[in-house]
Protein backbone atom coordinates (compact mmCIF):
# COMPACT_ATOMS: atom_id res chain seq x y z
CA UNK A 1 0.00 0.00 0.00
CA UNK A 2 1.42 3.36 -1.00
CA UNK A 3 2.23 6.02 1.53
CA UNK A 4 -0.34 8.36 -0.08
CA UNK A 5 -3.20 5.84 0.22
CA UNK A 6 -2.23 5.02 3.80
CA UNK A 7 -2.19 8.70 4.70
CA UNK A 8 -5.59 9.26 3.05
CA UNK A 9 -7.19 6.34 4.88
CA UNK A 10 -5.76 7.49 8.19
CA UNK A 11 -7.08 11.01 7.64
CA UNK A 12 -10.53 9.64 6.75
CA UNK A 13 -10.67 7.48 9.88
CA UNK A 14 -9.57 10.35 12.10
CA UNK A 15 -12.15 12.71 10.59
CA UNK A 16 -14.88 10.07 11.03
CA UNK A 17 -14.01 9.62 14.67
CA UNK A 18 -14.04 13.39 15.09
CA UNK A 19 -17.54 13.65 13.64
CA UNK A 20 -18.81 10.85 15.85
CA UNK A 21 -17.24 12.47 18.86
CA UNK A 22 -19.03 15.73 18.08
CA UNK A 23 -22.51 14.19 18.11
CA UNK A 24 -24.71 15.82 20.74
CA UNK A 25 -28.04 14.95 22.29
CA UNK A 26 -30.28 17.56 23.89
CA UNK A 27 -33.57 17.32 25.75
CA UNK A 28 -35.69 19.65 27.83
CA UNK A 29 -39.02 19.65 29.56
CA UNK A 30 -41.68 21.83 27.96
CA UNK A 31 -44.20 23.62 30.14
CA UNK A 32 -47.76 22.46 29.44
CA UNK A 33 -50.49 25.11 29.43
CA UNK A 34 -53.50 24.59 31.70
CA UNK A 35 -56.93 26.14 32.01
CA UNK A 36 -57.16 29.34 34.06
CA UNK A 37 -58.99 27.71 36.98
CA UNK A 38 -56.19 25.15 37.48
CA UNK A 39 -54.20 27.88 39.23
CA UNK A 40 -54.91 28.19 42.93
CA UNK A 41 -57.06 26.09 45.22
CA UNK A 42 -60.80 25.46 44.88
CA UNK A 43 -62.72 24.28 47.95
CA UNK A 44 -66.19 24.08 46.42
CA UNK A 45 -68.20 21.07 45.26
CA UNK A 46 -66.97 19.21 42.21
CA UNK A 47 -69.81 18.17 39.92
CA UNK A 48 -69.61 14.57 38.64
CA UNK A 49 -69.53 14.60 34.84
CA UNK A 50 -68.95 12.04 32.13
CA UNK A 51 -67.89 12.63 28.55
CA UNK A 52 -70.29 11.74 25.76
CA UNK A 53 -69.71 11.73 22.04
CA UNK A 54 -67.06 14.05 20.67
CA UNK A 55 -66.66 14.11 16.91
CA UNK A 56 -64.74 15.93 14.24
CA UNK A 57 -67.44 17.74 12.28
CA UNK A 58 -65.00 19.73 10.19
CA UNK A 59 -63.89 18.69 6.73
CA UNK A 60 -60.30 18.16 7.92
CA UNK A 61 -59.15 14.52 7.60
CA UNK A 62 -62.61 13.50 6.40
CA UNK A 63 -62.02 13.32 2.65
CA UNK A 64 -62.65 10.47 0.24
CA UNK A 65 -59.25 8.96 1.07
CA UNK A 66 -59.87 8.93 4.82
CA UNK A 67 -59.84 5.53 6.56
CA UNK A 68 -62.89 6.51 8.62
CA UNK A 69 -61.04 6.65 11.95
CA UNK A 70 -61.76 9.91 13.78
CA UNK A 71 -58.31 10.53 15.23
CA UNK A 72 -58.84 14.26 15.63
CA UNK A 73 -62.08 13.74 17.57
CA UNK A 74 -60.44 11.12 19.79
CA UNK A 75 -57.53 13.46 20.50
CA UNK A 76 -59.95 16.27 21.36
CA UNK A 77 -61.87 14.03 23.75
CA UNK A 78 -58.71 13.10 25.64
CA UNK A 79 -57.75 16.77 25.86
CA UNK A 80 -61.23 17.67 27.13
CA UNK A 81 -61.04 15.09 29.94
CA UNK A 82 -57.68 16.44 31.06
CA UNK A 83 -58.73 20.10 31.12
CA UNK A 84 -62.04 19.41 32.87
CA UNK A 85 -60.26 17.48 35.61
CA UNK A 86 -57.54 20.12 36.02
CA UNK A 87 -60.15 22.88 36.30
CA UNK A 88 -60.91 21.66 39.86
CA UNK A 89 -64.65 22.13 39.22
CA UNK A 90 -65.54 18.64 38.03
CA UNK A 91 -65.11 15.03 39.02
CA UNK A 92 -64.64 13.38 35.63
CA UNK A 93 -65.96 9.82 35.41
CA UNK A 94 -64.31 7.41 32.97
CA UNK A 95 -66.76 5.54 30.75
CA UNK A 96 -64.33 4.37 28.06
CA UNK A 97 -62.51 1.79 30.17
CA UNK A 98 -65.39 0.16 32.03
CA UNK A 99 -64.38 -3.42 31.26
CA UNK A 100 -60.76 -2.85 32.32
CA UNK A 101 -61.86 -1.13 35.54
CA UNK A 102 -64.34 -3.92 36.29
CA UNK A 103 -61.61 -6.51 35.79
CA UNK A 104 -59.31 -4.75 38.25
CA UNK A 105 -62.09 -4.61 40.87
CA UNK A 106 -62.64 -8.35 40.48
CA UNK A 107 -58.94 -9.01 40.91
CA UNK A 108 -59.12 -7.13 44.21
CA UNK A 109 -62.14 -9.20 45.25
CA UNK A 110 -64.27 -6.10 45.73
CA UNK A 111 -67.58 -4.84 44.37
CA UNK A 112 -67.58 -1.71 42.25
CA UNK A 113 -69.48 1.37 43.38
CA UNK A 114 -69.86 3.18 40.07
CA UNK A 115 -70.91 6.77 40.52
CA UNK A 116 -73.50 8.35 38.29
CA UNK A 117 -72.84 11.64 36.50
CA UNK A 118 -75.05 14.66 37.01
CA UNK A 119 -74.03 15.98 33.60
CA UNK A 120 -72.75 14.62 30.32
CA UNK A 121 -70.40 16.88 28.38
CA UNK A 122 -70.64 16.39 24.63
CA UNK A 123 -69.28 18.41 21.75
CA UNK A 124 -67.48 18.51 18.46
CA UNK A 125 -64.75 20.14 16.46
CA UNK A 126 -66.92 22.48 14.42
CA UNK A 127 -64.06 24.03 12.43
CA UNK A 128 -60.50 22.93 11.74
CA UNK A 129 -58.13 23.91 8.98
CA UNK A 130 -54.54 24.32 7.84
CA UNK A 131 -53.06 26.73 5.33
CA UNK A 132 -49.69 28.03 4.20
CA UNK A 133 -48.98 31.64 3.31
CA UNK A 134 -45.78 32.52 1.46
CA UNK A 135 -44.05 35.62 0.14
CA UNK A 136 -40.96 36.44 -1.93
CA UNK A 137 -38.61 39.40 -2.18
CA UNK A 138 -37.42 40.24 -5.71
CA UNK A 139 -38.78 36.96 -7.13
CA UNK A 140 -37.13 35.01 -4.33
CA UNK A 141 -33.61 36.26 -5.03
CA UNK A 142 -33.41 38.38 -1.88
CA UNK A 143 -35.45 36.09 0.31
CA UNK A 144 -38.64 34.18 0.82
CA UNK A 145 -40.81 33.16 3.72
CA UNK A 146 -43.53 30.73 4.62
CA UNK A 147 -46.10 30.78 7.42
CA UNK A 148 -48.05 27.70 8.46
CA UNK A 149 -51.40 28.52 10.06
CA UNK A 150 -53.69 26.13 11.95
CA UNK A 151 -57.17 27.10 13.16
CA UNK A 152 -59.68 25.25 15.34
CA UNK A 153 -63.08 25.93 16.87
CA UNK A 154 -64.56 23.75 19.62
CA UNK A 155 -68.19 23.50 20.75
CA UNK A 156 -69.12 22.01 24.15
CA UNK A 157 -72.62 21.15 25.36
CA UNK A 158 -73.52 20.34 28.98
CA UNK A 159 -76.48 17.97 29.19
CA UNK A 160 -78.50 17.22 32.35
CA UNK A 161 -78.36 13.42 32.66
CA UNK A 162 -81.86 13.19 34.19
CA UNK A 163 -83.77 15.50 31.87
CA UNK A 164 -81.55 15.39 28.73
CA UNK A 165 -81.73 19.19 28.70
CA UNK A 166 -78.77 21.10 27.30
CA UNK A 167 -78.21 23.46 30.21
CA UNK A 168 -75.22 25.32 28.79
CA UNK A 169 -73.11 25.60 25.64
CA UNK A 170 -69.64 27.06 25.26
CA UNK A 171 -67.29 27.67 22.37
CA UNK A 172 -63.59 28.17 22.09
CA UNK A 173 -61.37 29.00 19.13
CA UNK A 174 -57.65 29.28 18.59
CA UNK A 175 -55.05 29.89 15.91
CA UNK A 176 -51.38 28.87 15.76
CA UNK A 177 -48.73 30.19 13.38
CA UNK A 178 -45.25 28.95 12.52
CA UNK A 179 -43.12 31.28 10.40
CA UNK A 180 -39.72 30.79 8.78
CA UNK A 181 -37.76 33.09 6.50
CA UNK A 182 -34.76 32.67 4.23
CA UNK A 183 -32.72 35.80 3.43
CA UNK A 184 -30.01 35.74 0.74
CA UNK A 185 -29.67 32.00 1.07
CA UNK A 186 -29.41 32.02 4.86
CA UNK A 187 -32.05 30.48 7.10
CA UNK A 188 -34.69 28.12 5.81
CA UNK A 189 -38.36 27.35 5.45
CA UNK A 190 -39.72 24.61 7.67
CA UNK A 191 -41.52 21.58 6.31
CA UNK A 192 -45.06 20.63 7.31
CA UNK A 193 -45.35 20.65 11.11
CA UNK A 194 -48.00 18.15 12.24
CA UNK A 195 -47.65 19.22 15.89
CA UNK A 196 -49.57 22.40 15.10
CA UNK A 197 -52.74 20.28 14.94
CA UNK A 198 -52.43 19.24 18.57
CA UNK A 199 -51.33 22.68 19.73
CA UNK A 200 -54.24 24.57 18.20
CA UNK A 201 -56.70 21.89 19.32
CA UNK A 202 -55.45 22.21 22.90
CA UNK A 203 -55.68 26.01 22.72
CA UNK A 204 -59.28 25.99 21.47
CA UNK A 205 -60.26 23.38 24.07
CA UNK A 206 -58.77 25.42 26.91
CA UNK A 207 -60.76 28.44 25.78
CA UNK A 208 -64.00 26.43 25.68
CA UNK A 209 -63.40 24.92 29.13
CA UNK A 210 -62.52 28.36 30.52
CA UNK A 211 -65.89 29.68 29.32
CA UNK A 212 -67.63 26.64 30.82
CA UNK A 213 -66.00 27.15 34.22
CA UNK A 214 -66.65 30.90 34.22
CA UNK A 215 -70.36 30.31 33.57
CA UNK A 216 -70.56 27.69 36.31
CA UNK A 217 -68.85 29.95 38.85
CA UNK A 218 -71.25 32.74 37.87
CA UNK A 219 -74.24 30.49 38.55
CA UNK A 220 -75.41 30.33 34.94
CA UNK A 221 -75.74 26.54 35.14
CA UNK A 222 -75.38 23.76 37.70
CA UNK A 223 -77.80 25.13 40.27
CA UNK A 224 -80.46 22.51 39.50
CA UNK A 225 -78.35 19.66 40.88
CA UNK A 226 -76.23 21.54 43.43
CA UNK A 227 -75.97 19.65 46.66
List each model region and its residues:
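Short, solvent-exposed, polar/charged sequence segments at loop or secondary-structure edges
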Residues: 72-73, 85-139
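Amphipathic beta-strand/beta-sheet edge segments enriched in Tyr/Trp
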Residues: 122-187
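Extracytoplasmic
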Residues: 44-49, 75, 79, 85-87, ...
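Bacterial N-terminal signal peptides that target proteins for export
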Residues: 1-11
Amino acid sequence: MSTFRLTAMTAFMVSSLFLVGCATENSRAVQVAKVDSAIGTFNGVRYPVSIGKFDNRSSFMRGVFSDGVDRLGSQAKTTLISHLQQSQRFSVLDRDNMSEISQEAKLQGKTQTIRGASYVVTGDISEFGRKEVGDQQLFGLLGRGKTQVAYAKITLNVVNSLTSEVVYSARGAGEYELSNREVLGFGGTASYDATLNGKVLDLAMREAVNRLVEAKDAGQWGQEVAR
